[in-house]
Regions:
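A short acidic/small-residue loop/turn micro-motif
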Residues: 78, 121-122, 142-144
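Short loop/turn microsegments at loop-to-beta-strand junctions
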Residues: 25, 58, 124-125
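N-terminal beta-strand motif that seeds the catalytic metal site of vicinal oxygen chelate
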Residues: 8-38, 90-92, 140-144
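Extreme N-terminal basic, low-complexity initiation segments
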Residues: 1-9
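Vicinal oxygen chelate
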Residues: 32-35, 89-136
């Protein structure tokens, strides 16, 4: 397997024989309590609710802030819920322009920090929180 370096753009262009289209990220989570999830993402992280189907059998919401979209499904099928518990070893990283202001907003909303602001050896400054369902979020300075 080839090991690429950060400046491998010319090699990348040779390997990709088809045009590369833009990609965005939407992550899906599977909390038990959609109301708590909506409250957290709207009140604590200032997302806006873009779809609300909590009145349906398969309850679903979609939230958005900037280029980040979060879908949350409360499935009525037990096997689906069990298979999608918060994963260990995964952190969802949200980049912001002002990580200090973001931390201050989170703490002002009364949300506990899993880890306070810290400068990392690899460069960025970040803090960490858990959402109501236990998903681990790292909020960090935007990488340039």
């Amino acid at each position: 397997m080839a090991r690429f370096k950060a400046d491998a753009e010319p090699i990348f262009m040779l390997l990709c024989h088809h045009p590369v289209v833009e990609m965005t990220l939407r992550f899906e989570i599977f909390p038990e309590d959609l109301d708590a999830t909506v409250d957290f993402y709207m009140r604590v992280l200032c997302f806006r609710l873009t779809a609300d189907r909590r009145d349906q059998r398969e309850q679903y919401v979609s939230l958005e802030r900037g280029g980040v979209r979060v879908g949350a499904l409360r499935s009525v099928v037990p096997d689906v819920r069990a298979a999608r518990l918060p994963p260990a070893g995964v952190e969802l990283v949200l980049e912001v322009d002002d990580v200090v202001a973001e931390r201050d907003r989170v703490t002002a909303a009364g949300w506990p920090l899993a880890e306070d602001l810290r400068e990392r050896p690899w460069g960025p400054k970040d803090f960490r929180i858990l959402d109501p369902a236990g998903y681990y979020l790292r909020i960090t300075d935007r990488t340039r």
